[in-house]
Amino acid sequence: MNIGEASERSGLPSKTIRYYEDIGLIRPERGGNGYRDYAATDVHKLRFLQRSRGLGFSVEECRQLLALYEDKDRASADVRDIAQTKLTEIDRKIRELTELRRTLEHLVHACHGNDRPDCPILEELSDGA
């Protein structure tokens, strides 16, 4: 199938598919005319990559997960380690965002939001500069 059909079946834009090919995540066959010829296995890998990216895995983590998926002698512990590392990273980001939210919420409540020129939000931003 051509890249348009692979795009339609995988739900990924053609540009993303070409990028994944450029970085070696997929390797579609080339026909005698030089055009890419995507097989069902390529579309399956593209869907795998789409779901992996949707869960927040980096391109490099996707590369590792795809390699493990294709390795029938893999240890599930290796897959779990990658997922656990990502989960720890997500938890850290949630804590950071929660703290940012708390700070911003405090500043919003401290600001009168009226016609007066004084504003604790701007004062806080200025103090950090």
UniProtKB/Swiss-Prot annotation:
Residues 4-23 bind DNA. GO terms for molecular function: copper ion binding; DNA binding; DNA-binding transcription factor activity. Keywords: Activator, Copper, Cytoplasm, DNA-binding, Repressor, Transcription, Transcription regulation. GO terms for cellular component: cytoplasm. It is found in: Cytoplasm. GO terms for biological process: positive regulation of DNA-templated transcription. It holds the Pfam family MerR. It comes from the Bacteria. Residues 1-68 form the HTH merR-type domain. InterPro entries: CueR, DNA-bd_dom_put_sf, MerR-type_HTH_dom, MerR_fam, Tscrpt_reg_MerR_DNA-bd. Gene3D superfamilies: 1.10.1660.10. Signal peptide: none annotated. Regulates the transcription of actP. It detects cytoplasmic copper stress and activates transcription in response to increasing copper concentrations. In the absence of copper, it negatively regulates the transcription of actP. Homodimer. This is HTH-type transcriptional regulator HmrR. It comes from Rhizobium leguminosarum bv. viciae. The lineage of its organism: Bacteria, Pseudomonadati, Pseudomonadota, Alphaproteobacteria, Hyphomicrobiales.
